[in-house]
Protein backbone atom coordinates (compact mmCIF):
# COMPACT_ATOMS: atom_id res chain seq x y z
CA UNK A 1 0.00 0.00 0.00
CA UNK A 2 0.96 3.68 -0.04
CA UNK A 3 2.42 3.54 3.47
CA UNK A 4 4.58 0.52 2.64
CA UNK A 5 5.83 2.39 -0.44
CA UNK A 6 6.93 5.19 1.88
CA UNK A 7 8.78 2.75 4.08
CA UNK A 8 10.39 1.12 1.06
CA UNK A 9 11.56 4.57 -0.05
CA UNK A 10 13.48 4.84 3.22
CA UNK A 11 11.08 7.24 4.92
CA UNK A 12 9.77 7.33 8.45
CA UNK A 13 6.02 6.85 7.95
CA UNK A 14 3.38 8.33 10.25
CA UNK A 15 -0.35 8.10 9.55
CA UNK A 16 -2.06 10.85 11.52
CA UNK A 17 -5.65 10.96 12.74
CA UNK A 18 -7.26 14.33 13.40
CA UNK A 19 -10.70 15.93 13.41
CA UNK A 20 -12.28 15.21 10.04
CA UNK A 21 -15.86 14.26 10.82
CA UNK A 22 -17.24 16.59 8.13
CA UNK A 23 -15.88 17.12 4.63
CA UNK A 24 -14.59 20.59 3.72
CA UNK A 25 -16.60 20.42 0.49
CA UNK A 26 -19.82 19.93 2.42
CA UNK A 27 -18.97 22.57 5.01
CA UNK A 28 -18.06 25.24 2.45
CA UNK A 29 -20.47 24.28 -0.35
CA UNK A 30 -18.50 26.13 -3.01
CA UNK A 31 -17.94 29.34 -1.00
CA UNK A 32 -14.48 30.54 -2.01
CA UNK A 33 -13.90 32.51 1.19
CA UNK A 34 -14.65 29.47 3.35
CA UNK A 35 -12.07 26.92 2.23
CA UNK A 36 -8.89 28.47 3.57
CA UNK A 37 -10.12 29.39 7.09
CA UNK A 38 -11.86 26.02 7.39
CA UNK A 39 -8.61 24.23 6.65
CA UNK A 40 -6.57 26.54 8.90
CA UNK A 41 -9.01 25.77 11.71
CA UNK A 42 -8.49 22.04 11.32
CA UNK A 43 -4.72 22.38 11.02
CA UNK A 44 -4.34 24.60 14.09
CA UNK A 45 -7.17 23.27 16.22
CA UNK A 46 -8.28 26.88 16.72
CA UNK A 47 -11.34 28.43 15.13
CA UNK A 48 -10.46 30.96 12.43
CA UNK A 49 -12.69 33.80 11.31
CA UNK A 50 -14.55 32.91 8.15
CA UNK A 51 -14.62 29.19 8.89
CA UNK A 52 -18.01 27.43 9.02
CA UNK A 53 -19.72 27.50 12.41
CA UNK A 54 -19.72 23.69 12.55
CA UNK A 55 -16.03 23.95 13.47
CA UNK A 56 -16.45 26.40 16.36
CA UNK A 57 -16.08 23.74 19.03
CA UNK A 58 -12.77 22.36 17.79
CA UNK A 59 -10.14 21.73 20.46
CA UNK A 60 -6.42 22.31 20.02
CA UNK A 61 -5.65 18.63 20.50
CA UNK A 62 -7.98 17.77 17.61
CA UNK A 63 -5.88 19.79 15.16
CA UNK A 64 -3.22 18.47 12.83
CA UNK A 65 -0.28 20.44 14.24
CA UNK A 66 -0.84 19.49 17.88
CA UNK A 67 -1.35 15.85 16.99
CA UNK A 68 1.70 15.69 14.75
CA UNK A 69 3.86 17.32 17.41
CA UNK A 70 2.54 14.99 20.11
CA UNK A 71 3.07 11.91 17.95
CA UNK A 72 6.65 12.90 17.12
CA UNK A 73 7.48 13.53 20.78
CA UNK A 74 6.03 10.16 21.81
CA UNK A 75 7.91 8.33 19.06
CA UNK A 76 11.17 10.12 19.85
CA UNK A 77 10.84 9.16 23.52
CA UNK A 78 9.71 5.56 23.02
CA UNK A 79 12.07 4.76 20.13
CA UNK A 80 15.21 6.68 21.00
CA UNK A 81 17.26 5.08 18.22
CA UNK A 82 14.54 5.31 15.60
CA UNK A 83 15.48 8.73 14.25
CA UNK A 84 12.19 10.42 15.09
CA UNK A 85 13.83 13.19 17.10
CA UNK A 86 15.26 14.71 13.91
CA UNK A 87 11.75 15.90 13.01
CA UNK A 88 11.58 18.09 16.11
CA UNK A 89 13.20 21.47 16.62
CA UNK A 90 13.26 23.92 19.55
CA UNK A 91 10.27 26.23 19.32
CA UNK A 92 7.32 27.75 21.11
CA UNK A 93 4.16 25.75 20.52
CA UNK A 94 3.51 22.76 18.30
CA UNK A 95 3.65 24.42 14.89
CA UNK A 96 7.06 26.02 15.44
CA UNK A 97 8.53 22.90 17.09
CA UNK A 98 8.27 20.69 14.01
CA UNK A 99 11.27 20.46 11.64
CA UNK A 100 9.18 21.05 8.55
CA UNK A 101 12.07 21.10 6.09
CA UNK A 102 12.74 17.42 6.83
CA UNK A 103 9.15 16.30 6.38
CA UNK A 104 7.28 15.07 3.30
CA UNK A 105 3.60 15.88 3.78
CA UNK A 106 1.06 13.73 1.97
CA UNK A 107 -2.68 13.21 2.05
CA UNK A 108 -5.65 11.74 0.22
CA UNK A 109 -8.77 13.72 -0.69
CA UNK A 110 -9.41 16.17 2.17
CA UNK A 111 -6.00 15.29 3.61
CA UNK A 112 -4.36 16.18 0.31
CA UNK A 113 -5.83 19.65 0.53
CA UNK A 114 -4.44 19.98 4.04
CA UNK A 115 -1.03 18.86 2.74
CA UNK A 116 -1.15 21.52 0.02
CA UNK A 117 -1.93 24.24 2.56
CA UNK A 118 0.80 23.06 4.93
CA UNK A 119 3.19 23.35 2.00
CA UNK A 120 2.05 26.90 1.43
CA UNK A 121 2.62 27.90 5.06
CA UNK A 122 5.80 25.88 5.71
CA UNK A 123 8.91 25.02 3.71
CA UNK A 124 8.59 21.23 3.65
CA UNK A 125 10.66 18.63 1.82
CA UNK A 126 7.78 17.75 -0.52
CA UNK A 127 4.00 17.71 -0.82
CA UNK A 128 2.26 14.63 -2.25
CA UNK A 129 -1.46 14.90 -3.01
CA UNK A 130 -3.70 11.94 -3.84
CA UNK A 131 -7.09 12.61 -5.47
CA UNK A 132 -6.81 16.22 -4.36
CA UNK A 133 -7.02 19.18 -3.80
CA UNK A 134 -10.80 19.32 -4.19
CA UNK A 135 -11.57 22.91 -3.12
CA UNK A 136 -13.62 24.48 -5.93
CA UNK A 137 -16.11 27.32 -6.16
CA UNK A 138 -19.70 27.09 -7.34
CA UNK A 139 -18.36 27.98 -10.81
CA UNK A 140 -16.05 24.95 -10.67
CA UNK A 141 -12.95 27.12 -10.36
CA UNK A 142 -10.12 26.20 -7.96
CA UNK A 143 -10.35 28.01 -4.63
CA UNK A 144 -8.35 31.23 -4.48
CA UNK A 145 -5.83 29.92 -1.97
CA UNK A 146 -4.70 27.36 -4.55
CA UNK A 147 -3.56 29.93 -7.11
CA UNK A 148 0.12 30.12 -7.89
CA UNK A 149 0.05 33.89 -7.33
CA UNK A 150 -0.19 33.21 -3.60
CA UNK A 151 3.01 33.10 -1.55
CA UNK A 152 3.99 29.46 -1.08
CA UNK A 153 6.93 28.62 1.19
CA UNK A 154 7.22 25.30 -0.64
CA UNK A 155 7.35 25.93 -4.38
CA UNK A 156 4.61 23.90 -6.12
CA UNK A 157 6.58 24.06 -9.37
CA UNK A 158 9.45 22.18 -7.73
CA UNK A 159 8.21 20.19 -4.75
CA UNK A 160 4.55 19.28 -5.27
CA UNK A 161 3.58 15.87 -6.68
CA UNK A 162 0.08 14.56 -7.35
CA UNK A 163 -1.84 11.48 -8.48
CA UNK A 164 -5.47 11.32 -9.61
CA UNK A 165 -7.68 8.78 -11.33
CA UNK A 166 -9.89 9.23 -14.40
CA UNK A 167 -13.59 9.37 -13.62
CA UNK A 168 -13.24 10.72 -10.08
CA UNK A 169 -16.70 12.14 -9.45
CA UNK A 170 -16.01 12.99 -5.79
CA UNK A 171 -13.09 15.29 -6.62
CA UNK A 172 -13.50 16.20 -10.31
CA UNK A 173 -11.56 19.46 -9.94
CA UNK A 174 -8.19 18.05 -8.92
CA UNK A 175 -6.55 18.58 -12.33
CA UNK A 176 -7.63 22.24 -12.42
CA UNK A 177 -6.20 22.70 -8.94
CA UNK A 178 -2.85 21.30 -10.05
CA UNK A 179 -2.74 23.77 -12.92
CA UNK A 180 -3.68 26.64 -10.60
CA UNK A 181 -0.78 25.68 -8.35
CA UNK A 182 1.60 25.89 -11.30
CA UNK A 183 2.75 22.29 -11.09
CA UNK A 184 4.71 21.06 -14.13
CA UNK A 185 3.35 18.28 -16.33
CA UNK A 186 5.73 15.68 -14.94
CA UNK A 187 4.39 16.18 -11.42
CA UNK A 188 0.73 15.88 -12.47
CA UNK A 189 -0.32 12.24 -12.84
CA UNK A 190 -3.98 11.85 -13.77
CA UNK A 191 -3.70 8.24 -14.90
CA UNK A 192 -3.99 6.22 -11.69
CA UNK A 193 -5.19 2.66 -12.19
CA UNK A 194 -8.63 1.88 -10.77
CA UNK A 195 -8.79 -1.65 -9.34
CA UNK A 196 -11.71 -3.94 -8.56
CA UNK A 197 -11.59 -3.18 -4.83
CA UNK A 198 -11.86 0.61 -5.13
CA UNK A 199 -13.73 3.35 -6.98
CA UNK A 200 -11.80 6.06 -8.82
CA UNK A 201 -11.52 8.44 -5.87
CA UNK A 202 -9.96 5.87 -3.56
CA UNK A 203 -7.81 4.20 -6.20
CA UNK A 204 -4.87 6.56 -5.71
CA UNK A 205 -4.48 5.31 -2.14
CA UNK A 206 -5.90 1.78 -2.20
CA UNK A 207 -4.94 0.13 -5.49
CA UNK A 208 -1.53 -1.61 -5.45
CA UNK A 209 -1.32 -1.20 -9.23
CA UNK A 210 -0.28 2.39 -8.50
CA UNK A 211 2.81 1.38 -6.52
CA UNK A 212 5.20 2.62 -9.21
CA UNK A 213 3.58 6.06 -9.14
CA UNK A 214 3.74 6.14 -5.34
CA UNK A 215 7.42 5.27 -5.42
CA UNK A 216 8.18 7.96 -7.99
CA UNK A 217 6.44 10.64 -5.93
CA UNK A 218 7.97 9.60 -2.62
CA UNK A 219 11.59 9.21 -3.71
Regions found by a protein language model. Give the residues of each.
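Short, surface-exposed "cap/lid" segments of acyl-processing enzymes
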Residues: 1-31, 169-172
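Sec/Tat-exported extracytoplasmic proteins
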Residues: 72-79, 122, 131, 218
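Short amphipathic alpha-helical segments and helix-helix/interface helices
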Residues: 2-4, 116, 149-150
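Extracellular/periplasmic catalytic domains that process cell-envelope and extracellular macromolecules
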Residues: 6-8, 96-99, 120, 152-156
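Alpha/beta-hydrolase active-site loop
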Residues: 33-96
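The feature captures the conserved acid-bearing segment of alpha/beta-hydrolase catalytic domains
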Residues: 125-215
Amino acid sequence: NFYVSGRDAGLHVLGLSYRSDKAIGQLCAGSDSCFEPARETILRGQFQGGAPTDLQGIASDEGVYERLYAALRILAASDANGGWAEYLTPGVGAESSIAWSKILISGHSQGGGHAALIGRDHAVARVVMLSSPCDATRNDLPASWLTKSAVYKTDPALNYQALGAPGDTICPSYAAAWLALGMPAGARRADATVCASSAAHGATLACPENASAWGAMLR
